[in-house]
C-alpha cells in the first residue's frame, strides 16, 4: 500500500484505510526546473581551527572544568583534537541511563563501555568528540544546520521524545552509520587532509555538544566536545536545559556559528519544530571574542592529541566541499546533463562509483539501466519540495545509490549541497532492501559470527554473545511464515524493515511488543537497537579499541562477518562479501528493483525528509521503468511487504508526501504504481 502523508505514522498503522491515497493514480510532475546551483567553495583554515579550540578552552576554564575538543571539515577530515588535562582524568562511559553507582543500566551494543579502567587503561574521549563534530557537519548543509541535540530529537523511539503514542523519530537508526568498517567511508592517518566522506569512530552522535561550523553562510565543518564524561543522549532534547558539553561547544563555534535562518529551530517535521541548541550567549561563562589566542594557551592546560587513523597531531586546514580534493564535486562529464549532479571521486579525481552493470550471471542491471535509474531519481529530487531545507521552497537535496542483488554498488550520485550523512546511508538503505528481499537472507544471518556485547567497568571486562541467526526465527514467527527470508517471495522496502525494527509494534504504540528485529524492553536503547547494530557491532568494537590503543588491529572494509575473540585478543573478518558492507539501515528511503519478477538490485535515497526519500526512490524507479520500456521496475504489487499483516497490523511499503512538487499541484503521485 502506498500511503500519502496525512496522519502520523503511528495512526497510519492503526487507521490504514484512512491513510490510503485515492484519485489521480500515478500522477507525476511534468514541469522541469532549471539546473540547481553549485555550492560555494569555502574551507576552514588553520587559523579558524585554532580559534575554535581556543574559544572552547576558554569556556571550559571559566567553568573550572576540562574538555576534549575536536574540529572536522565538511567531509569529516579531523583538523584538530585537543585534550585538556591528563588522560586518566578524561574518563568516558557510553550509556543512555546510569544506576546510583554510575554504571550503565542496559547492557548490549555500545552500552556500558567505560574507559579508562584498570582492565583497559585506554581512552575514548577523543573518539566521542570526533563523532560529535562529524555529526554536526554531516547532518547539516548550506540549507539546514542540525546539531547533535537535533539528532537526539529525531532518533528516539517517539517523536517528539517523551510524547508517548507518537511514531519513532524520522531518522530512527541513523546513529549507526558512517562507521569505520564501512566499505564506503574513507580513512586518513597522514599529515594532509584527503578525500571524504571520512569515517566516524562511533557513528553519528545524539549527545548534545556537537555543532556545525559556517563561513559566510557556507557549511565548512563541525566542532564536538566531551567534558561531562557521559556519551549518551538527551531524553528530552526539546527542553531548555543545556549540557556542559553543549555550552563549551557553543562557545567554540562563536563567529563560525550557523546562520539563524537555517538553524534547526526554523525547520519543522510533521508539524514539530526541531531544536538546535538549549544554550545561548547569555549562558556562557566566558566571552569568546576575548578568548586568548591558541598560541597563548599554557601547555599545562592541555595539548593537541594524535588519534590513530584520524588526526596526526598537527592542526591542519580543511577541504572545500565541492572541490575534487574533498571527494565530492560537480559532475564534469555527460552522465547527468542539466541535473546539477555531484559525484564521488578518489584522490586522483577519478569517479569512485560510475554507472556499471550488476554482477549476477543472468538478468543483471546494465550500465545504461543504472544510469537511467540515477537520472530519473535526480529528476524527481530536483522537482521535490525539500522538507528540511531553508528557505522554504527549496528543492530536496539527496544522495542516490543503486546496488545489485548482492549489494555491490553500481552507481551513486548526489544533489548539490546534499548533507554528507546521506551518502553512506543511501548505500545502507539500498543494501538493506536488496538483502531482506533476497532468498538467502536467513542463511546469511545464520552463518555470521557470534555478536559480542561488552561491559567495561572497574570490575573488568565482561563479554556475552548472541547469534545473529536468532533474529531469523523471531522474524518468521512474527510474520507468520516459516519460509520468510528463505524464498525471496516478499519485497521489503527499508520502511517495512524499519517497521519490524522498532521497539514497539505498531510503531509508536508504547507498551506494544517489539518488532522481531528489535531488542525487547529493558535491553533496547539508542546504543543497542537490535539486528541493525548486532550485524556490525563486532567491527565497531574492534575499531574503537584499536583506535584507543588496546592492541587490536584496525578494521578492514566491511562491517559484517567480523569474528571478535571473546577475550578481545584479536579479530578476523571471515567473509569478504559486501551484502551489508557498510551496515544496515532502518529508516525509510529504499525499494528493491525487479526484472520480470526477479530481484536484480535496489535503489536507496537519503538526505531530506524520509517521505521525500521514499518518494524519490520509488517514483524514480517507476519513471526509470517507463523510460526503459518496463525492462526493470518496482516489485509486483502482490509481493510487496504491505501485503503482510503481522500481529494484525499491515506493514508499510512506501509513504509519499502530499503535494510534493515545487512546480506542480499533483497529488497522490505514488498511488497506483
Please tell me what each predicted stretch does.
Residues 15-18:
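C-terminal motif of bacterial Sec signal peptides marking the signal peptidase cleavage site
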Residues 23-673:
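Flexible, solvent-exposed loop/hinge segments and secondary-structure transition points
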Amino acid at each position: 500500500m502506498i500511503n500519502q502523508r496525512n496522519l502520523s505514522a503511528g495512526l497510519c498503522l492503526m487507521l490504514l484505510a484512512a491513510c490510503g491515497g485515492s484519485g489521480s493514480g500515478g500522477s507525476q510532475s511534468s514541469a522541469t526546473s532549471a539546473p540547481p546551483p553549485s555550492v560555494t567553495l569555502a574551507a576552514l583554515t588553520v587559523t579558524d581551527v585554532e580559534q575554535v579550540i581556543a574559544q572552547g578552552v576558554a569556556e571550559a576554564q571559566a567553568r573550572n572544568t576540562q574538555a576534549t575538543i575536536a574540529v572536522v571539515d565538511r567531509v569529516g577530515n579531523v583538523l584538530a583534537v585537543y585534550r585538556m588535562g591528563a588522560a586518566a582524568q578524561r574518563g568516558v562511559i557510553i550509556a543512555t541511563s546510569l544506576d546510583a553507582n554510575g554504571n550503565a543500566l542496559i547492557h548490549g551494543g555500545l552500552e556500558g563501555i567505560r574507559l579508562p579502567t584498570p582492565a583497559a587503561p585506554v581512552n575514548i574521549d577523543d573518539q566521542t568528540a570526533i563523532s560529535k563534530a562529524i555529526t554536526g557537519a554531516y547532518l547539516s548543509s548550506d540549507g539546514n544546520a542540525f546539531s547533535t541535540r537535533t539528532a537526539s530529537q529525531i532518533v528516539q523511539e517517539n517523536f517528539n521524545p517523551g510524547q508517548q503514542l507518537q511514531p519513532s523519530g524520522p531518522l530512527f537508526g541513523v546513529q549507526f552509520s558512517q562507521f569505520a568498517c564501512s566499505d564506503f567511508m574513507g580513512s586518513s592517518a597522514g599529515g594532509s587532509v584527503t578525500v571524504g566522506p571520512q569515517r566516524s569512530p562511533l557513528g553519528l552522535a545524539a549527545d548534545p555538544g556537537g555543532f556545525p561550523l559556517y563561513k559566510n553562510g557556507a557549511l565548512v565543518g563541525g566542532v564536538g566536545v566531551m567534558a561531562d564524561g557521559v556519551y549518551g543522549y538527551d531524553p528530552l532534547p526539546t527542553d531548555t536545559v543545556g549540557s556542559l558539553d553543549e555550552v563549551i561547544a557553543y562557545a567554540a563555534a562563536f563567529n563560525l556559528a550557523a546562520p539563524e535562518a537555517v538553524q534547526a529551530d526554523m525547520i519543522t517535521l510533521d508539524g514539530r519544530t526541531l531544536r538546535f541548541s538549549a544554550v545561548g550567549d547569555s549562558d556562557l561563562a566566558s566571552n569568546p571574542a576575548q578568548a586568548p589566542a591558541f598560541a597563548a594557551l599554557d601547555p599545562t592546560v592541555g595539548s593537541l592529541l594524535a588519534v590513530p587513523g584520524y588526526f596526526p597531531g598537527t592542526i591542519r586546514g580543511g577541504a572545500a566541499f565541492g572541490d575534487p580534493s574533498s571527494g565530492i564535486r560537480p559532475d564534469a562529464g555527460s552522465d547527468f546533463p542539466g541535473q546539477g549532479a555531484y559525484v564521488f571521486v578518489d584522490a586522483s579525481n577519478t569517479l569512485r562509483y560510475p554507472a556499471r552493470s550488476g554482477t549476477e550471471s543472468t538478468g543483471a542491471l546494465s550500465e545504461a539501466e543504472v544510469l537511467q535509474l540515477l537520472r530519473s531519481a535526480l529528476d524527481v529530487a530536483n522537482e521535490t519540495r525539500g522538507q528540511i531545507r531553508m528557505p522554504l521552497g527549496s528543492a530536496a537535496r539527496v544522495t542516490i545509490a543503486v546496488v545489485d542483488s548482492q549489494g555491490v554498488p553500481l552507481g551513486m550520485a548526489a544533489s548539490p549541497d546534499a548533507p554528507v550523512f546521506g551518502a553512506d546511508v543511501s548505500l545502507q538503505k539500498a543494501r538493506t532492501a536488496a538483502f531482506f528481499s533476497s532468498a538467502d537472507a536467513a542463511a546469511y544471518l545464520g552463518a555470521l559470527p557470534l555478536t559480542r556485547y561488552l561491559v567495561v567497568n572497574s570490575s573488568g571486562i565482561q563479554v556475552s554473545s548472541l547469534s545473529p541467526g536468532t533474529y531469523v526465527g523471531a522474524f518468521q514467527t512474527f510474520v507468520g511464515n516459516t519460509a520468510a527470508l528463505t524464498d525471496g517471495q516478499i519485497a521489503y522496502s527499508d520502511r517495512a524493515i524499519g517497521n519490524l525494527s522498532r521497539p514497539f509494534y505498531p510503531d509508536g504504540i508504547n507498551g506494544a511488543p517489539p518488532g522481531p528485529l528489535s531488542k525487547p524492553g529493558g535491553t533496547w536503547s539508542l546504543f543497542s537497537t537490535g539486528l541493525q547494530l548486532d550485524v556490525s557491532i563486532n567491527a565497531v568494537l574492534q575499531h574503537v579499541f584499536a583506535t584507543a590503543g588496546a592492541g587490536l588491529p584496525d578494521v578492514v572494509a566491511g562491517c559484517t562477518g567480523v569474528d571478535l575473540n571473546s577475550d578481545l585478543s584479536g579479530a578476523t573478518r571471515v567473509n569478504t562479501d559486501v551484502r551489508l558492507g557498510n551496515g544496515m539501515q532502518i529508516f525509510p528511503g529504499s525499494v528493491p528493483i525487479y526484472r520480470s519478477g526477479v530481484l536484480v538490485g535496489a535503489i536507496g535515497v537519503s538526505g531530506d525528509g524520509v517521505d521525500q526519500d521514499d518518494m524519490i526512490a520509488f517514483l524514480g524507479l517507476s519513471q526509470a521503468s517507463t523510460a526503459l520500456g518496463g525492462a526493470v521496475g518496482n516489485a509486483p504489487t502482490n509481493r510487496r511487504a504491505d501485503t503482510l499483516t503481522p500481529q494484525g497490523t499491515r506493514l508499510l511499503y512506501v509513504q509519499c508526501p502530499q503535494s510534493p512538487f515545487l512546480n506542480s499541484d499533483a497529488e497522490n503521485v505514488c498511488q497506483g504504481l
